[in-house]
Amino acid sequence: LFRKTPFAFLGTFLMTFDFMHLAQTRLGTIDSYPVLFIILEFYFMMRYAYHSFYHEKFWKTLPSLFLSGLFMGLGMASKWIGIYAAVGLAVLFFTIFGTRTKEYIAARRELAEEKTLSAERRAQCENITSKYPKRALWTILCCVLFFVVIPLGIYIGSYYQFLRIDAPHHGLKEVWNYQLHMFNYHKGVFESHPFESSWWQWPLDIRNIWYYVSDSMPQGWVSSISALGNPAVWWTGLGCLIWCVVRAVQGYGKRDKRIWWVVIGFAANFLPWVLVPRVTFVYHYFASVPFIILATVLFFEDLYDKKTWAKPVIIGFMVLVVALYALFYPVLTGIPMTSFHASLLKWLPSWTLY
Protein backbone atom coordinates (compact mmCIF):
# COMPACT_ATOMS: atom_id res chain seq x y z
CA LEU A 1 0.00 0.00 0.00
CA PHE A 2 2.74 2.47 0.94
CA ARG A 3 5.66 0.80 -0.87
CA LYS A 4 7.92 2.24 1.82
CA THR A 5 8.93 0.08 4.77
CA PRO A 6 9.01 2.90 7.38
CA PHE A 7 5.41 3.90 6.67
CA ALA A 8 4.20 0.29 6.50
CA PHE A 9 5.87 -0.14 9.88
CA LEU A 10 4.16 3.00 11.22
CA GLY A 11 0.71 1.61 10.39
CA THR A 12 1.50 -1.71 12.04
CA PHE A 13 3.00 0.12 15.01
CA LEU A 14 -0.13 2.21 15.60
CA MET A 15 -2.41 -0.82 15.37
CA THR A 16 -0.19 -2.74 17.79
CA PHE A 17 -0.28 -0.02 20.42
CA ASP A 18 -3.95 0.86 20.15
CA PHE A 19 -5.90 0.12 23.33
CA MET A 20 -8.96 -1.31 21.57
CA HIS A 21 -6.86 -3.80 19.65
CA LEU A 22 -5.27 -5.05 22.86
CA ALA A 23 -8.46 -5.22 24.93
CA GLN A 24 -10.65 -6.92 22.35
CA THR A 25 -8.13 -9.49 21.14
CA ARG A 26 -6.82 -10.30 24.61
CA LEU A 27 -10.35 -11.06 25.79
CA GLY A 28 -10.87 -13.28 22.76
CA THR A 29 -13.92 -11.40 21.46
CA ILE A 30 -15.24 -12.28 18.02
CA ASP A 31 -14.53 -8.77 16.71
CA SER A 32 -10.85 -9.39 16.04
CA TYR A 33 -11.65 -11.94 13.32
CA PRO A 34 -13.93 -9.83 11.11
CA VAL A 35 -11.63 -6.83 11.57
CA LEU A 36 -8.71 -8.89 10.23
CA PHE A 37 -10.77 -10.13 7.30
CA ILE A 38 -12.04 -6.61 6.52
CA ILE A 39 -8.47 -5.32 6.37
CA LEU A 40 -7.51 -8.14 4.00
CA GLU A 41 -10.51 -7.81 1.69
CA PHE A 42 -9.88 -4.09 1.24
CA TYR A 43 -6.17 -4.68 0.77
CA PHE A 44 -6.69 -7.14 -2.06
CA MET A 45 -9.25 -4.88 -3.73
CA MET A 46 -6.61 -2.15 -3.67
CA ARG A 47 -4.13 -4.61 -5.19
CA TYR A 48 -6.67 -5.27 -7.95
CA ALA A 49 -6.95 -1.54 -8.67
CA TYR A 50 -3.22 -1.38 -9.38
CA HIS A 51 -3.33 -4.16 -11.97
CA SER A 52 -3.19 -3.07 -15.60
CA PHE A 53 -6.44 -4.15 -17.22
CA TYR A 54 -5.00 -3.97 -20.72
CA HIS A 55 -1.30 -4.72 -20.44
CA GLU A 56 -1.24 -7.72 -18.10
CA LYS A 57 -2.49 -11.17 -18.85
CA PHE A 58 -6.11 -11.24 -17.74
CA TRP A 59 -5.72 -14.20 -15.39
CA LYS A 60 -3.10 -12.29 -13.39
CA THR A 61 -5.76 -9.77 -12.32
CA LEU A 62 -8.01 -12.47 -10.87
CA PRO A 63 -6.15 -13.68 -7.74
CA SER A 64 -6.56 -10.29 -6.04
CA LEU A 65 -10.31 -10.31 -6.76
CA PHE A 66 -10.61 -13.91 -5.59
CA LEU A 67 -8.82 -13.21 -2.30
CA SER A 68 -10.87 -10.07 -1.73
CA GLY A 69 -14.08 -12.08 -2.14
CA LEU A 70 -12.75 -14.93 -0.02
CA PHE A 71 -11.98 -12.66 2.92
CA MET A 72 -15.27 -10.84 2.43
CA GLY A 73 -17.04 -14.17 2.91
CA LEU A 74 -14.97 -14.99 5.99
CA GLY A 75 -15.70 -11.55 7.44
CA MET A 76 -19.47 -11.87 6.97
CA ALA A 77 -19.45 -15.42 8.32
CA SER A 78 -17.65 -14.19 11.45
CA LYS A 79 -19.92 -11.26 12.21
CA TRP A 80 -22.50 -9.24 10.32
CA ILE A 81 -20.33 -6.12 10.37
CA GLY A 82 -18.69 -7.79 7.38
CA ILE A 83 -21.81 -6.87 5.40
CA TYR A 84 -21.14 -3.17 6.00
CA ALA A 85 -17.59 -3.61 4.72
CA ALA A 86 -18.89 -5.49 1.67
CA VAL A 87 -20.85 -2.40 0.61
CA GLY A 88 -17.65 -0.36 0.64
CA LEU A 89 -15.92 -3.10 -1.30
CA ALA A 90 -18.65 -2.94 -3.94
CA VAL A 91 -18.25 0.84 -4.20
CA LEU A 92 -14.51 0.43 -4.75
CA PHE A 93 -14.93 -2.30 -7.36
CA PHE A 94 -17.54 -0.44 -9.41
CA THR A 95 -15.46 2.72 -9.21
CA ILE A 96 -12.51 0.80 -10.66
CA PHE A 97 -14.72 -0.88 -13.25
CA GLY A 98 -16.35 2.44 -14.14
CA THR A 99 -12.96 4.04 -14.73
CA ARG A 100 -12.00 1.26 -17.13
CA THR A 101 -15.33 1.57 -18.91
CA LYS A 102 -14.75 5.31 -19.39
CA GLU A 103 -11.33 4.53 -20.84
CA TYR A 104 -12.98 2.15 -23.31
CA ILE A 105 -15.65 4.68 -24.33
CA ALA A 106 -13.04 7.41 -24.78
CA ALA A 107 -10.84 5.12 -26.88
CA ARG A 108 -13.75 4.15 -29.14
CA ARG A 109 -14.70 7.80 -29.58
CA GLU A 110 -11.17 8.80 -30.53
CA LEU A 111 -10.93 6.03 -33.11
CA ALA A 112 -14.42 6.73 -34.50
CA GLU A 113 -13.82 10.46 -34.90
CA GLU A 114 -10.68 9.68 -36.90
CA LYS A 115 -8.68 12.28 -35.05
CA THR A 116 -5.07 12.76 -35.88
CA LEU A 117 -3.65 10.35 -33.36
CA SER A 118 -0.05 9.54 -32.76
CA ALA A 119 0.94 6.01 -33.60
CA GLU A 120 1.42 5.30 -29.91
CA ARG A 121 -2.01 6.65 -28.92
CA ARG A 122 -3.72 4.80 -31.79
CA ALA A 123 -2.10 1.56 -30.64
CA GLN A 124 -3.30 2.23 -27.08
CA CYS A 125 -6.87 2.88 -28.24
CA GLU A 126 -6.92 -0.23 -30.41
CA ASN A 127 -5.56 -2.31 -27.54
CA ILE A 128 -8.27 -1.00 -25.20
CA THR A 129 -11.16 -1.44 -27.64
CA SER A 130 -10.08 -4.95 -28.59
CA LYS A 131 -9.61 -6.24 -25.06
CA TYR A 132 -12.26 -4.44 -22.98
CA PRO A 133 -15.50 -6.22 -24.04
CA LYS A 134 -14.28 -9.75 -23.41
CA ARG A 135 -12.32 -8.90 -20.27
CA ALA A 136 -15.17 -6.84 -18.82
CA LEU A 137 -17.62 -9.71 -19.33
CA TRP A 138 -15.28 -12.26 -17.77
CA THR A 139 -14.55 -9.91 -14.87
CA ILE A 140 -18.27 -9.59 -14.08
CA LEU A 141 -18.77 -13.36 -14.31
CA CYS A 142 -15.78 -13.97 -12.03
CA CYS A 143 -17.12 -11.42 -9.56
CA VAL A 144 -20.41 -13.29 -9.35
CA LEU A 145 -18.38 -16.34 -8.35
CA PHE A 146 -15.92 -14.51 -6.07
CA PHE A 147 -18.32 -12.12 -4.33
CA VAL A 148 -21.65 -13.99 -4.37
CA VAL A 149 -21.24 -17.75 -4.74
CA ILE A 150 -18.07 -18.23 -2.65
CA PRO A 151 -19.09 -15.89 0.23
CA LEU A 152 -22.53 -17.51 0.34
CA GLY A 153 -20.89 -20.92 0.44
CA ILE A 154 -18.59 -19.81 3.25
CA TYR A 155 -21.50 -18.37 5.23
CA ILE A 156 -23.57 -21.54 4.93
CA GLY A 157 -20.45 -23.63 5.52
CA SER A 158 -19.93 -21.88 8.85
CA TYR A 159 -23.01 -23.83 9.99
CA TYR A 160 -21.43 -27.14 9.01
CA GLN A 161 -21.28 -28.53 12.55
CA PHE A 162 -24.95 -27.63 13.01
CA LEU A 163 -26.06 -29.08 9.67
CA ARG A 164 -24.17 -32.35 10.08
CA ILE A 165 -26.23 -33.32 13.13
CA ASP A 166 -28.59 -36.07 12.04
CA ALA A 167 -31.67 -34.84 13.85
CA PRO A 168 -34.82 -32.84 13.14
CA HIS A 169 -34.55 -29.03 12.92
CA HIS A 170 -30.96 -29.06 11.71
CA GLY A 171 -31.47 -28.13 8.07
CA LEU A 172 -31.10 -25.08 5.86
CA LYS A 173 -34.57 -23.89 6.81
CA GLU A 174 -33.47 -23.61 10.43
CA VAL A 175 -30.29 -21.80 9.35
CA TRP A 176 -32.47 -19.24 7.57
CA ASN A 177 -34.73 -18.94 10.61
CA TYR A 178 -31.67 -18.23 12.75
CA GLN A 179 -30.81 -15.31 10.47
CA LEU A 180 -34.29 -13.88 10.94
CA HIS A 181 -34.07 -14.42 14.68
CA MET A 182 -30.70 -12.65 14.89
CA PHE A 183 -31.95 -9.74 12.80
CA ASN A 184 -35.09 -9.32 14.88
CA TYR A 185 -33.07 -9.57 18.08
CA HIS A 186 -30.66 -6.82 17.08
CA LYS A 187 -33.51 -4.71 15.75
CA GLY A 188 -35.16 -4.82 19.15
CA VAL A 189 -32.24 -4.19 21.55
CA PHE A 190 -33.35 -0.88 23.05
CA GLU A 191 -32.73 -1.47 26.75
CA SER A 192 -30.26 1.01 28.17
CA HIS A 193 -26.82 -0.08 29.36
CA PRO A 194 -24.50 1.78 31.74
CA PHE A 195 -21.66 1.62 29.19
CA GLU A 196 -23.56 2.20 25.97
CA SER A 197 -22.27 4.92 23.67
CA SER A 198 -23.50 6.59 20.50
CA TRP A 199 -21.75 6.51 17.14
CA TRP A 200 -20.70 10.16 17.34
CA GLN A 201 -18.88 9.53 20.63
CA TRP A 202 -16.61 6.79 19.29
CA PRO A 203 -14.14 8.82 17.18
CA LEU A 204 -13.74 11.22 20.11
CA ASP A 205 -13.10 8.35 22.55
CA ILE A 206 -15.71 9.79 24.90
CA ARG A 207 -17.09 6.63 26.50
CA ASN A 208 -15.26 3.40 27.30
CA ILE A 209 -16.77 0.00 28.02
CA TRP A 210 -15.88 -1.44 31.42
CA TYR A 211 -15.53 -5.23 31.31
CA TYR A 212 -14.21 -6.28 34.71
CA VAL A 213 -13.19 -5.14 38.18
CA SER A 214 -11.83 -7.29 41.01
CA ASP A 215 -13.55 -7.02 44.38
CA SER A 216 -10.73 -8.81 46.23
CA MET A 217 -7.90 -6.30 45.93
CA PRO A 218 -6.16 -4.93 49.05
CA GLN A 219 -6.81 -1.38 50.16
CA GLY A 220 -5.33 1.16 47.76
CA TRP A 221 -5.10 -1.26 44.82
CA VAL A 222 -7.30 -1.76 41.76
CA SER A 223 -7.63 -4.49 39.11
CA SER A 224 -9.82 -3.53 36.18
CA ILE A 225 -10.30 -4.16 32.44
CA SER A 226 -11.71 -1.59 30.02
CA ALA A 227 -11.84 -1.11 26.26
CA LEU A 228 -11.26 2.31 24.77
CA GLY A 229 -9.00 3.87 22.18
CA ASN A 230 -5.47 5.15 22.58
CA PRO A 231 -6.16 8.92 22.61
CA ALA A 232 -3.02 9.64 20.59
CA VAL A 233 -4.12 7.17 17.90
CA TRP A 234 -7.84 7.97 17.82
CA TRP A 235 -7.76 11.75 18.16
CA THR A 236 -4.90 12.12 15.70
CA GLY A 237 -6.58 9.61 13.40
CA LEU A 238 -9.81 11.62 13.37
CA GLY A 239 -7.95 14.75 12.32
CA CYS A 240 -6.06 12.85 9.64
CA LEU A 241 -9.28 11.28 8.34
CA ILE A 242 -10.78 14.76 7.95
CA TRP A 243 -7.60 15.73 6.08
CA CYS A 244 -8.12 12.74 3.75
CA VAL A 245 -11.74 13.73 3.09
CA VAL A 246 -10.69 17.29 2.25
CA ARG A 247 -7.94 16.01 -0.04
CA ALA A 248 -10.37 13.66 -1.76
CA VAL A 249 -12.88 16.48 -2.35
CA GLN A 250 -10.07 18.68 -3.70
CA GLY A 251 -9.28 16.02 -6.29
CA TYR A 252 -6.08 14.56 -4.89
CA GLY A 253 -7.78 11.17 -4.84
CA LYS A 254 -7.46 11.00 -8.63
CA ARG A 255 -3.68 10.99 -8.31
CA ASP A 256 -3.50 8.91 -5.16
CA LYS A 257 -6.19 6.21 -5.08
CA ARG A 258 -5.25 5.34 -1.51
CA ILE A 259 -7.05 8.46 -0.25
CA TRP A 260 -10.42 7.30 -1.58
CA TRP A 261 -9.64 3.75 -0.47
CA VAL A 262 -9.24 4.96 3.13
CA VAL A 263 -12.26 7.30 3.04
CA ILE A 264 -14.59 4.69 1.52
CA GLY A 265 -13.29 1.98 3.85
CA PHE A 266 -13.95 4.13 6.90
CA ALA A 267 -17.36 5.28 5.66
CA ALA A 268 -18.50 1.72 4.90
CA ASN A 269 -17.62 0.49 8.38
CA PHE A 270 -18.72 3.55 10.35
CA LEU A 271 -21.68 5.27 8.68
CA PRO A 272 -24.12 2.31 8.90
CA TRP A 273 -24.00 2.69 12.68
CA VAL A 274 -25.50 6.16 12.31
CA LEU A 275 -28.71 4.45 11.17
CA VAL A 276 -28.68 1.60 13.70
CA PRO A 277 -31.35 2.24 16.35
CA ARG A 278 -30.21 -0.44 18.82
CA VAL A 279 -27.97 0.10 21.83
CA THR A 280 -24.35 0.38 20.69
CA PHE A 281 -20.91 0.30 22.30
CA VAL A 282 -17.48 1.67 21.54
CA TYR A 283 -16.21 -1.71 20.32
CA HIS A 284 -18.49 -1.30 17.31
CA TYR A 285 -15.92 1.26 16.15
CA PHE A 286 -13.16 -1.36 16.10
CA ALA A 287 -13.57 -2.15 12.38
CA SER A 288 -13.15 1.56 11.54
CA VAL A 289 -9.92 1.97 13.51
CA PRO A 290 -7.60 0.47 10.82
CA PHE A 291 -8.78 3.15 8.40
CA ILE A 292 -8.10 6.09 10.73
CA ILE A 293 -4.68 4.56 11.29
CA LEU A 294 -4.09 4.39 7.53
CA ALA A 295 -5.30 8.00 7.25
CA THR A 296 -2.68 8.92 9.85
CA VAL A 297 0.05 7.16 7.89
CA LEU A 298 -1.01 8.91 4.68
CA PHE A 299 -0.85 12.27 6.45
CA PHE A 300 2.60 11.64 7.90
CA GLU A 301 3.85 10.31 4.56
CA ASP A 302 2.72 13.53 2.89
CA LEU A 303 4.26 15.59 5.68
CA TYR A 304 7.54 13.69 5.40
CA ASP A 305 7.75 14.36 1.67
CA LYS A 306 7.21 18.10 2.14
CA LYS A 307 8.82 19.11 5.44
CA THR A 308 12.36 18.49 6.67
CA TRP A 309 11.19 18.57 10.28
CA ALA A 310 8.60 15.80 9.78
CA LYS A 311 10.85 12.93 10.91
CA PRO A 312 11.30 14.09 14.55
CA VAL A 313 7.57 14.88 14.70
CA ILE A 314 6.70 11.34 13.59
CA ILE A 315 9.17 9.81 16.06
CA GLY A 316 7.79 12.00 18.85
CA PHE A 317 4.27 10.90 17.99
CA MET A 318 5.30 7.24 18.14
CA VAL A 319 6.93 7.79 21.53
CA LEU A 320 3.71 9.38 22.79
CA VAL A 321 1.66 6.42 21.54
CA VAL A 322 3.90 3.92 23.35
CA ALA A 323 4.00 6.05 26.52
CA LEU A 324 0.20 6.14 26.72
CA TYR A 325 0.05 2.41 26.02
CA ALA A 326 2.39 1.75 28.94
CA LEU A 327 0.51 4.17 31.19
CA PHE A 328 -2.91 2.63 30.48
CA TYR A 329 -1.73 -0.99 30.16
CA PRO A 330 -2.90 -2.06 33.65
CA VAL A 331 -6.45 -0.83 33.10
CA LEU A 332 -6.58 -2.65 29.74
CA THR A 333 -5.38 -5.99 31.08
CA GLY A 334 -6.44 -6.24 34.72
CA ILE A 335 -2.90 -6.04 36.09
CA PRO A 336 -3.12 -4.67 39.66
CA MET A 337 -2.26 -0.98 39.98
CA THR A 338 -2.45 1.57 42.75
CA SER A 339 -5.59 3.64 43.14
CA PHE A 340 -3.45 6.73 42.58
CA HIS A 341 -2.25 5.35 39.23
CA ALA A 342 -5.85 4.57 38.26
CA SER A 343 -6.98 8.08 39.19
CA LEU A 344 -4.40 9.55 36.80
CA LEU A 345 -6.05 7.72 33.90
CA LYS A 346 -9.48 9.31 34.23
CA TRP A 347 -8.92 11.98 31.61
CA LEU A 348 -12.60 12.43 30.83
CA PRO A 349 -15.49 12.44 33.33
CA SER A 350 -17.32 9.94 31.08
CA TRP A 351 -14.55 7.34 31.45
CA THR A 352 -15.28 4.65 34.06
CA LEU A 353 -12.06 2.71 34.49
CA TYR A 354 -12.22 1.32 38.04
Descriptions of predicted regions:
Residues 1-2, 37-49, 70, 87-94, ...:
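Transmembrane alpha-helical segments
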Residues 2, 6, 41-64, 94-101:
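Membrane-interface transmembrane helices that cradle and orient dolichyl/undecaprenyl
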Residues 7, 60-64, 231-233, 251-265, ...:
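Membrane-interfacial loop-to-transmembrane alpha-helix junctions, especially the N-terminal start
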Residues 11-16, 23, 72, 76:
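Short helix- or helix-capping micro-motifs
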Residues 20-33, 78-81:
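Short acidic/glycine- and proline-prone juxtamembrane loop motifs at membrane-interface regions
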Residues 64-67, 97-108, 112-147, 151, ...:
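Transmembrane helical bundles and short interhelical boundary loops of multi-pass, membrane-embedded
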Residues 81-106:
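Transmembrane-embedded, aromatic-rich helix segments that form part
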Residues 215-219, 223-255:
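Hydrophobic, aromatic-rich transmembrane alpha-helices
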